[in-house]
């Protein structure tokens, strides 16, 4: 049988035809590789310790992907050193999609401003793949606090500098930076009281040692369920599942549009073929749409969070701008 080519090929001279065929073949190779992906076990390195919320959620997604792909997806815990150990483990890995990294938005957007010397440059060393989860922070106050709304809290803070104090789990933490963002949004100046451990912070809130702190439902939940603290508002665009009685910051009289969230994502080594990145995105989106995943996420106070590459980069730019501006204003460095 005589091969049939596109008419455009028939008008090409011999060398041009050969070059065109070679280019078409090369262009098709990544797609073919993506269709076959994965061809061996996939490793996902996480900076979060075993049993922590982001790690448990990652294992849920990994288990689903293992079944979908017919290949093991192995979670490799490398906690410590502000995530640098995990990051170094993947930075120089083969860019074929079989080595992935979990990071959170603080590591991606805040650390470049908190550390003068970083062992990585995010977009130089990694390909953003997709977020997998998100949760919003609550304004947490003592159960007996005189503040009943964000209007009350901001009015007290506007009475004068340092009339209100807030706690965080350490200098440069999302809780610290988020509170500084709230100061900017409300034109106030509050006293920062840093703690060494997250658990110490919410005990301190419950004991009325500090006026308030940002906290997630997972991190601040034990003291809230014990009746020692309560949620004044949630820093989200709308009320969140599980706490329909808690108003947003804006609904409670705080600044309109104020949001503070934590989210984690998957990244691949730089140079991973676009077709493979897109296949992982598509399959993760499929996993996150499953009802049992949504239910298990909800039990951990997470929501499935998926973005394509363009949306992911846009979110990173937005977070980097907010974190960067605030960290520069605070003039803090962790090295």
Model regions and ranges:
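Hinge/capping helix and adjacent helix->loop/strand transition within the periplasmic-binding protein
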Residues: 89-98, 105, 113-200, 249-251, ...
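Bacterial N-terminal signal peptides
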Residues: 16-29
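C-terminal lobe and pocket-closing loops
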Residues: 220-289, 321
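An extracytoplasmic/periplasmic, membrane-proximal ligand-sensing/linker region
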Residues: 39-41, 188, 225, 274-335
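N-terminal (or domain-start) structured segment
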Residues: 34-124, 163, 187-216, 223, ...
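N-terminal secretory signal peptides that target proteins for export/translocation
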Residues: 1-13
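A ligand-binding cleft/hinge motif common to bilobed small-molecule-binding domains
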Residues: 106-117, 176, 180-185, 212-246
């Amino acid at each position: 049988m005589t091969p049939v080519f596109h008419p455009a090929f028939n008008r090409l001279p011999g060398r041009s035809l050969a070059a065109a065929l070679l280019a078409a073949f090369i262009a098709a190779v990544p797609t073919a590789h993506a269709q076959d992906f994965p061809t061996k076990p996939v490793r996902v390195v996480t900076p979060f310790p075993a049993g922590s919320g982001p790690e448990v959620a990652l294992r849920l997604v990994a288990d689903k992907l293992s079944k979908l792909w017919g290949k093991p997806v192995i979670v490799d815990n490398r906690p410590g050193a502000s995530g640098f150990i995990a990051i170094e483990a993947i930075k120089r890995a083969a860019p074929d999609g079989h080595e992935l990294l979990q990071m959170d938005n603080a590591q991606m957007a805040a650390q470049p401003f908190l550390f003068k010397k970083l062992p990585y440059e995010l977009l130089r060393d990694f390909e953003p793949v997709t977020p997998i989860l998100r949760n919003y922070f609550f304004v947490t106050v003592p159960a007996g606090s005189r503040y009943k709304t964000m209007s009350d809290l901001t009015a007290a803070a506007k009475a004068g500098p340092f009339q209100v104090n807030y706690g965080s789990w350490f200098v440069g933490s999302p809780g610290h930076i988020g509170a500084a963002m709230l100061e900017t949004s409300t034109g106030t100046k509050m006293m920062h009281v840093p703690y060494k451990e997250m658990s110490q912070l919410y005990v301190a809130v419950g004991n009325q040692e500090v006026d308030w702190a940002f906290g997630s439902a997972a991190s601040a939940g034990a003291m809230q369920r014990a009746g020692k603290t309560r949620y004044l508002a949630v820093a989200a665009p709308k009320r969140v599942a599980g706490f329909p009685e808690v108003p947003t910051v804006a609904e409670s009289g705080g600044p309109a549009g104020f949001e503070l969230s934590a989210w984690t994502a998957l990244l691949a080594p730089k140079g991973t073929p676009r077709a493979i990145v897109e296949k992982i995105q598509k399959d993760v989106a499929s996993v996150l749409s499953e009802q049992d995943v949504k239910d298990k996420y909800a039990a951990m106070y997470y929501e499935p969070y998926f973005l394509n590459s363009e949306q992911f980069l846009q979110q990173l730019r937005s977070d980097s701008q907010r974190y960067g501006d605030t960290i520069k204003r605070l003039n803090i460095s962790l090295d």
